[in-house]
Amino acid sequence: MVAAGSAALLIAGCGTGTTNHNGTSTPSPSTAASTPAPAGMPGMPGMNEPMPAGKGLSASESGFTLVPGTTTIPANTPTSFTFRITGPDGAPVTQFVPEQTQLLHFYLVRADLTGFAHLHPSMAADGTWTAPLPAMAPGNWRAYTQFTARHPSDVTVPLVLSTPLTVPGAATVQPIPAPSNTANVDGYTVTLSGQPAAGQDSPLTFAFSLDGQPVTDLQPYLDTYAHVTAIRVANLAFAHLHPQNPVNGDHGGPTLTVEAHFPDSGDWRLFVQFQTGGIVHTAEMTLTVG
């Protein structure tokens, strides 16, 4: 089953902003309501992506390490966050393979899943990345980096690395919405069908409607018609969902199928980002994986 809300899961999307469980935007990182679509760069379609290694809960995997410039972020004010990805030789990695139009996808998730942001940082020549963070509410957060790096042996390695972040101040923890198969955002309704099982590839289908009518004008967003991110409620593990629908101009919808692989059972929070009229919308729901 899935839970109602107005933020999102992970297939292929990006943006900045934050939404709470009531579907309203808050001054913390998440693109829940609506966000102008960012400019992209040529890359590989999401449906060709290999599955990243691990569950996204470690800063190191396969010899690569996420090295943050800091793990403490000031509350309620936009700031910049710098980090590097080091390789097996300990040197900063500067060679990445584009994935869904970007060299690296950066996610911010608050521990109670009320804050979410999908950002695309820039990389300097020395391998230092800079992400412009929106204002973040006090509390515990986790930053995820999703990328495909080139190993010194010229092998490509898809990875999700993460690190915990702390935003000082009085934090209010919100309960996770109960599972439901619909979510509403900006007048749109997103309905999910499918029964995923842990450890197996499971197709999930999202149906998009506006005022009760099927949506057929979804625009390409990061080389696909939607971007879905899944975060496990119990431990903030990360799951990657792959879009199956080919892109055919501004005519996406009314349904979109993704290939989901959830490593563990339990409740997962989904963040579904899709674009219409040049605006990225983020729908959020809770899904129970058996």
Question: Which residues does each PLM region occupy?
Answer:
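Bacterial signal peptide processing site
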Residues: C14-T18
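Transition segment at domain starts
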Residues: P45-F64, G69, V160-G199
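Surface-exposed interaction/gating patches
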Residues: V173-H240, P254-F271, T276, H281
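Aromatic sugar-binding surface patches on proteins
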Residues: G115, A124-T130, N248-T257
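Extracytoplasmic low-complexity, Pro/Thr/Ser/Ala/Gly-rich segments
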Residues: G23-L104, T182
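Beta-strand-rich structural segments
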Residues: P78-A91, T145, D201-Q213
